[in-house]
């Protein structure tokens, strides 16, 4: 089997240090399945992980994947050889930048039948992130009618997470205010179903007042938490809930949350697979719901660019595009 990896952490300006490696196909044990990978999607987390310490070389990155089950471990009950599946993997295991990959069945689901592999692979990591935010942290109802009248502000609605989060929020009854800064990203947010699109490069508090937008029940920050921290506190309702997927780079005053009794949560979708939590199966269930909603026409895939072929050159170029932070939707590599 072929893998694309690297020996040491590196920045892109150091040049392309991705290399091709070969190893024997692994044999699945316990609840693992062996997947022949067809397509992968590259995420911002890949660019961050590339610069972290390598504990075992080569480091093979990659999270989103879709492929065909080739073999199953003795404890597997959910899948059979030949099933087409998708998943987001875990950073403490070999990643999907490879032709084959082992993954626990608890974080895998059968892929949608009505869209292509290159489309479906855009959804696992971002979809699970959004599902965990809405259902585990915000605790919205699975009954859309019970969420009517509640609202969410999604900061950076045109990114991979924002794109699917908007669709999920609309599917489950929320009013969605999102942000963008360019005409093409604004149009993309509207295509995803946003009710209102604001400009995040301008004063959001002022825009809320000018458009007479009420304070929101929930805020989902998918970009630069430090930059929007105080703004989010202003725009959330008393007893509201803010969740971010972006770690702080600066010290922030948590006491500022007290006056409104705001709940603040960090969402990290890899927490379940890294720690093998007792409820890890939820990721399988969330992916199943994504498949169902894709097949019913409630969600659309978020793929906007496809590279052909798994190579060091394509992977390096993908990381370059993501680090420019102007990506709309998701970037996919067809293996």
Swiss-Prot record:
Keywords: Metal-binding, Oxidoreductase, Zinc. The keyword Zinc applies. Coiled coil: none annotated. Signal peptide: none annotated. InterPro entries: ADH-like_C (IPR013149), ADH-like_N (IPR013154), ADH_Zn_typ-1 (IPR014182), GroES-like_sf (IPR011032), NAD(P)-bd_dom_sf (IPR036291), PKS_ER (IPR020843), Quin_OxRdtase/zeta-crystal_CS (IPR002364), YIM1/Zinc_Alcohol_DH_Fams (IPR050700). It holds the Pfam family ADH_N. It comes from the Bacteria. The keyword Zinc applies. GO terms for molecular function: oxidoreductase activity; zinc ion binding. Belongs to the zinc-containing alcohol dehydrogenase family. Quinone oxidoreductase subfamily. NCBIfam families: adh_fam_1 (TIGR02817). This is Zinc-type alcohol dehydrogenase-like protein SAV2186. It comes from Staphylococcus aureus (strain Mu50 / ATCC 700699).
């Amino acid at each position: 089997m072929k893998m694309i990896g690297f020996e040491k952490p590196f920045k892109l300006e150091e040049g392309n240090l991705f290399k091709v490696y070969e190893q024997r196909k692994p044999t699945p044990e316990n609840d693992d399945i062996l997947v022949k990978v067809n397509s992968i999607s590259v995420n911002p987390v890949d660019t961050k992980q590339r610069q972290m310490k390598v504990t075992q070389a080569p480091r093979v990155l990659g999270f989103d994947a879709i492929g065909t089950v080739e073999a199953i471990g003795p404890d597997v009950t959910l899948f059979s050889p030949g099933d087409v599946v998708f998943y987001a993997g875990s950073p403490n295991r070999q990643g999907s930048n490879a032709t084959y990959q082992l993954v626990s069945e608890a974080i895998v689901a059968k892929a949608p039948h009505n869209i292509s592999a290159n489309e479906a692979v855009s959804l696992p990591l971002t979809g699970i992130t959004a599902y965990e935010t809405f259902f585990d942290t915000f605790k919205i109802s699975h009954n859309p009618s019970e969420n009517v009248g509640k609202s969410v502000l999604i900061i950076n609605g045109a990114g991979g997470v924002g794109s699917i989060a908007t669709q999920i929020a609309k599917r489950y009854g929320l009013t969605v205010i999102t942000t963008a800064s360019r005409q093409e990203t604004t149009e993309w947010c509207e295509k995803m179903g946003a009710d209102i699109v604001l400009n995040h490069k301008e004063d959001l508090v002022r825009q809320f007042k000018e458009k007479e937008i009420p304070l929101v029940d929930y805020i989902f920050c998918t970009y630069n938490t430090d930059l929007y921290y105080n703004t989010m506190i202003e725009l959330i309702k008393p007893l509201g809930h803010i969740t971010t997927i972006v770690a702080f780079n600066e010290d922030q005053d948590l006491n500022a949350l007290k006056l409104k009794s705001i709940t603040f949560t960090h969402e990290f979708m890899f927490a379940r697979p890294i720690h093998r939590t007792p409820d890890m199966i939820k990721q399988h269930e969330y992916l199943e719901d994504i498949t169902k909603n894709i097949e019913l026409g409630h969600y659309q895939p978020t793929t906007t660019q496809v590279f052909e072929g798994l190579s060091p050159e394509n992977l390096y170029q993908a990381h370059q595009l993501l680090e420019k932070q102007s990506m709309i939707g998701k970037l996919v590599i067809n293996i």
